[in-house]
Amino acid sequence: MSIGVIVFPGSNCDRDVQWATDGCLGMSTRRVWHEETDLSGFDAIILPGGFSYGDYLRCGAIARFAPALQSLIDFAAKGGRVLGICNGFQVLTELGLLPGALTRNQNLHFICEDAPLKVVSQRTAWMQGYNDRALTLPIAHGEGRYQCSDDTLKQLQDDDAIALSYGNNPNGSVFNIAGITNASGSVLGLMPHPERACDPAIGGTDGRRMLEALLG
């Protein structure tokens, strides 16, 4: 099992992700500079949190043009597992691998707190380990409000592609959405940070089972 973590100028959670996947879970993990184009040696790709390219224009808008992401489109089309966390989720929507968009929080403030979450669908491997369907993960974002059209929301519901919802909806996301998958379930994007909840020494392990899904 080999994991690639794509690093953009402005990424700040890539080392956290590598520590979680490699240090905690023993998965061989390499950080991949955004100019690299060969992703063929990886079993899964993670887009980490941060502020890619300073979030200029809007979050993820510039990162979508990175050479590595053009290769990521092909990787995902072949069924490769892709996980986008926080800014990574924003990038996946800009890239078109996931529908909708992430916009400014409803209260216009940066939110940093532990968020109670509910597993909405256990259809995909990402969520199958959460038998109790309730978990808590850290969030830290200023543009995490998930927005989509009514037609897109219906499609997400029809595809059973809403993976996670907020218990208290801190940012005003439509339908309390915290994370979604593509129709096949191979691509997951979420605003909460599972990599920050893998070790009891730093406050919980609710993110661990989600990352273990990278093992297939």
Curated annotation (Swiss-Prot):
UniProt EC number: 6.3.5.3, 3.5.1.2
Keyword check for ATP-binding: yes
GO cellular component terms given for this protein: cytoplasm
Pfam families xref list: GATase_5
GO biological process, alphabetically ordered: 'de novo' IMP biosynthetic process
Pathway listed: Purine metabolism; IMP biosynthesis via de novo pathway; 5-amino-1-(5-phospho-D-ribosyl)imidazole from N(2)-formyl-N(1)-(5-phospho-D-ribosyl)glycinamide: step 1/2
Key words of the record: ATP-binding, Cytoplasm, Glutamine amidotransferase, Hydrolase, Ligase, Nucleotide-binding, Purine biosynthesis
Cell compartments where the protein resides: Cytoplasm
Role this protein plays: Part of the phosphoribosylformylglycinamidine synthase complex involved in the purines biosynthetic pathway. Catalyzes the ATP-dependent conversion of formylglycinamide ribonucleotide (FGAR) and glutamine to yield formylglycinamidine ribonucleotide (FGAM) and glutamate. The FGAM synthase complex is composed of three subunits. PurQ produces an ammonia molecule by converting glutamine to glutamate. PurL transfers the ammonia molecule to FGAR to form FGAM in an ATP-dependent manner.
UniProt protein name: Phosphoribosylformylglycinamidine synthase subunit PurQ
Organism: Synechococcus sp. (strain CC9605)
Gene that encodes it: purQ
